[in-house]
Every structure is written in structure tokens, then in C-alpha cells.
């Protein structure tokens, strides 16, 4: 085992010495302390995970108190010593000669072929990572208590590709920011803010008009829900939403299609419907993704096919058009940078058309 040490969680101070002695004697693994249950520092959860930081009273005070407790219950010096013993990780880049030798047919041709495929993918992806828009693109980023789930890595990659992210609130702001070239509607808790979202009619109308006018948009999960005609809130009432996507969203009693998936763009005819290029691309490649939601839609889309690696289960999902990609799956852009690149290229086209 590569496990060099463990820390016990939610353990009582009375039990810790006995458990430490037992584990170290029987398993030969260092026990580096424990985290006791501190009632004043408990952070409650809800249907999609933790409460947001800004919703927690006295968060800084709780963290300071927890830090004080951990200074006494963790063996800090031993943890630092163990960390300093870790070897440096080295991943040398393959030279062209190495690539050829690795990929020559041999007794392990299957392994060689796999290495060649991975090298080809990395070479292709490196070209996408370095792409940058020749002009700065103003991209509206929905960011408030209703839309708060996003990966900072995704935002960093968009910035490195030339995006200026302009935050706005579909809950509180009456209008979209001026001179936008694209929209990002990520996940969050629209179901907890259904009434406020419905009452902000001007924002709903402006978002709908912008997308229908051709403004590129990426929408995930909560953002996808917001684009429907109506959405059921946690209070059981249905609220009017942006109306870009025909249909409604409702709450289910359990997590729906939960877990990791692989997305592949449907080609040609799907369910009797002719598929078109998505964000200007006929093939956006394969995208690892995940779904994490209690809600479902009567119009999930058919632009992509989702499959689960551990089973034969699969389903069609996501809406795709020349300027829109919207669905329940959450994407990680570094796993498939073709998607943010295609999105920003469409934003650049849109910017040029607005002159």
C-alpha cells in the first residue's frame, strides 16, 4: 500500500489513544491525529450538498475555532515531515523518437497502440489549449445564490482563451450587462429561488431574446433548468422561466441519472431528427462529465449520447444548435477543450456580426 498515514475523523478523544495503538501495531501505518466532532463547527448539508459559504453565520469564526482544535488533535510536525519525504514527481515529455519506438508493433501491440492513441490525443489537445481569441470577448457569467456551481478551472481556461467574464445576477439584476458576446449559465439552486427568478421578468426576457438572436450560450444543470418554459420549485409550485427550451422541469424523489458519464455527439439522424452542427462543429469529441440533480425535464435533448462506463446504460441528452449547448451534464473543460474553444469561436463570430 502507498498509504503512509491516516487521520481519524469524528473520533472521541477517549477512544483515540486505543485506536492509534491498534492501527499502528496491527497495520504498521502511522496515525497522525484525529478530528473530533465540534458542535459549534458543524456545517449542515441539503439536497445537493453543503450550504454555501455566504449562508453560514460566523463562518470565519467557526474555521478559526476548528483550526485551534486541530492544532491540538493533529500531529502537525509529523504530517509536515511525512510530506517532505515525498519524492519529486517527474513526467518527461515524449520526444518524437520515443513516440515512434513506443508505437512500433511488438509483442505488446495492444499497449503500444493505446500509447499511440494517447499521444495523438495529447498532441491534438495541446493545440487547442494554446488557442486564444484575437479579440477580447465579454462573456456574461450568471453568478448568485441561484447559480453558484462552477469549476474555477473552467473559468481559468476561458480567461486564458481570451474571455473577460462579467458576473451578473438573474435573481437581483434587472438587465444583462452591456455589450456581451456570450452567456454562461451554470448550475446551482434555481429551485430554491423560483419565485425570485420568475418575478425578474426583464432578465428572463433579455436572456431569452439574446439567445434567440444568436448569442452563444453554454447552460448546465440549473442553467439548463432556467432556460425551460417552467420549473417546479422546492415549494412544489411551478414558476415561469426564460422559455428558450420548450417544456418543463419538475422535482423527482431521488437523484436522477446520477454519476459519471461519457458524452459523445450524436451524428446524422437521432430519433428521427436530423442533427446539425453544434457550436459550429460536426464533432466535438468525447467529453467526460457527470450528472448530479433531483430534477428532470420532459425535453432533455438528443444532441449527445451519454453512457456509463460500469454498465450498458445510456441515454440521449443535451440541446445543441449553432450557438447553444444546454443540458443537465456538468462538463470539465480541460477534459475536452474543444467545447470552450468552439463556444468562444462562436462568440467571436457573434461579436463581429454586432458591429
Predicted regions and their residues:
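NTP-binding/hydrolysis catalytic cores, primarily Walker-type P-loop NTPases
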Residues: 57-98, 122-125, 129, 133-136, ...
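Phosphate-binding active sites in nucleotide-utilizing proteins
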Residues: 134-201, 205-210
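Cysteine-nucleophile active-site neighborhood
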Residues: 190-272
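Internal gly/pro-rich beta-alpha loop/helix module
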Residues: 1-96
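Structural motif
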Residues: 7, 184-186, 328
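C-terminal and late-domain segments of enzyme folds
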Residues: 3, 134-135, 147-159, 164-166, ...
Amino acid at each position: 500500500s502507498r498509504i503512509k498515514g491516516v487521520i481519524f475523523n469524528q473520533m472521541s478523544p477517549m477512544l483515540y489513544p486505543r485506536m492509534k495503538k491498534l492501527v499502528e501495531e496491527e497495520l504498521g501505518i502511522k496515525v497522525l491525529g484525529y478530528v473530533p466532532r465540534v458542535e459549534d463547527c458543524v456545517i449542515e448539508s441539503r439536497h445537493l450538498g453543503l450550504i454555501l459559504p455566504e449562508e453560514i453565520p460566523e463562518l470565519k469564526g467557526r474555521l478559526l475555532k476548528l483550526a485551534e482544535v486541530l492544532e491540538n488533535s493533529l500531529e502537525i510536525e509529523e504530517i509536515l515531515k511525512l510530506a517532505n519525504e515525498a519524492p519529486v514527481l517527474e513526467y518527461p515529455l515524449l520526444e518524437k523518437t520515443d513516440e515512434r519506438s513506443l508505437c512500433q508493433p511488438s509483442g505488446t501491440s495492444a499497449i503500444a497502440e493505446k500509447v499511440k492513441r494517447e499521444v495523438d490525443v495529447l498532441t491534438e489537445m495541446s493545440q487547442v489549449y494554446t488557442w486564444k481569441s484575437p479579440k477580447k470577448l465579454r462573456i456574461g457569467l450568471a453568478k448568485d445564490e441561484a447559480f453558484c456551481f462552477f469549476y474555477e478551472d473552467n473559468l481559468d481556461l476561458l480567461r486564458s482563451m481570451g474571455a473577460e467574464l462579467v458576473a451578473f445576477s438573474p435573481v437581483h439584476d434587472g438587465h444583462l450587462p452591456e455589450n456581451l458576446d456570450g452567456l454562461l449559465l451554470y448550475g446551482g439552486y434555481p429551485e430554491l429561488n423560483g419565485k425570485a427568478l420568475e418575478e425578474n421578468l426583464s432578465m428572463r426576457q433579455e436572456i431569452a431574446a439574446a439567445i434567440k438572436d444568436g448569442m452563444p450560450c453554454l447552460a448546465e444543470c440549473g442553467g439548463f433548468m432556467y432556460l425551460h418554459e417552467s420549473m417546479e420549485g422546492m415549494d412544489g409550485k411551478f414558476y415561469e422561466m426564460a422559455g428558450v427550451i420548450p417544456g418543463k422541469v419538475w422535482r423527482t424523489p431521488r437523484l436522477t441519472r446520477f454519476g459519471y458519464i461519457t458524452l459523445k455527439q450524436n451524428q446524422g439522424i437521432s430519433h428521427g431528427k436530423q442533427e446539425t452542427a453544434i457550436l459550429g462543429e460536426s464533432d466535438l469529441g468525447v467529453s467526460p462529465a457527470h450528472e448530479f440533480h433531483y430534477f428532470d425535464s420532459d425535453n432533455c435533448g438528443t444532441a449527445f449520447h451519454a453512457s456509463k462506463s460500469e454498465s450498458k446504460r445510456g441515454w440521449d441528452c443535451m440541446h445543441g444548435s449553432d450557438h447553444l449547448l444546454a443540458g443537465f451534464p456538468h462538463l470539465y473543460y480541460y477534459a475536452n477543450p474543444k467545447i470552450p474553444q468552439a463556444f468562444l469561436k462562436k462568440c467571436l463570430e457573434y461579436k463581429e456580426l454586432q458591429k
